[in-house]
Amino acid sequence: SLERERRTSVGRSYYAVFNHLRLRLEVLKPLPMNADVHALVVKYLSNAPNRELNSVGQTLRDLRAARNTADYDLAAMVDDKQSSTSMLKADRAIKKSQGISEAALRAAINVLPTYH
C-alpha cells in the first residue's frame, strides 16, 4: 500500500542521516554496537560547541521521532507531506553535515566525559 511505502520512506530518511553521521563519528571514536548508539550520536551533536552540529542533531532527533511514529504507531496516518518532509530534512542534514570539519566532530566527541 502507499501508506506502507510512506512509513518505510520516513524510516529510511532517518537511517540515511544516522548512518552518515555514525560513520563520520566512529572513525574518530569507537561507538557502541547496540541500540545506545542512536542516542549517543544525537547527544554528541546536541552538546557540540558548533551550531551546525546542533542543528543536524535536532534534525536527527526529529527524524527519529518521526521514524518511531511511522514504525510503531499504526493508528497514526503517514501522509505524503510527512514522507516528503522527512526526505527533505534528511537531504538537508546530510548536505549540512558534509560541510562540517573533522575537527568540529572531534570537538563534539570531546565535550562529553568518557567513563571507564
List PLM regions with ranges:
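Terminal alpha-helical segments
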Residues: S1-H116
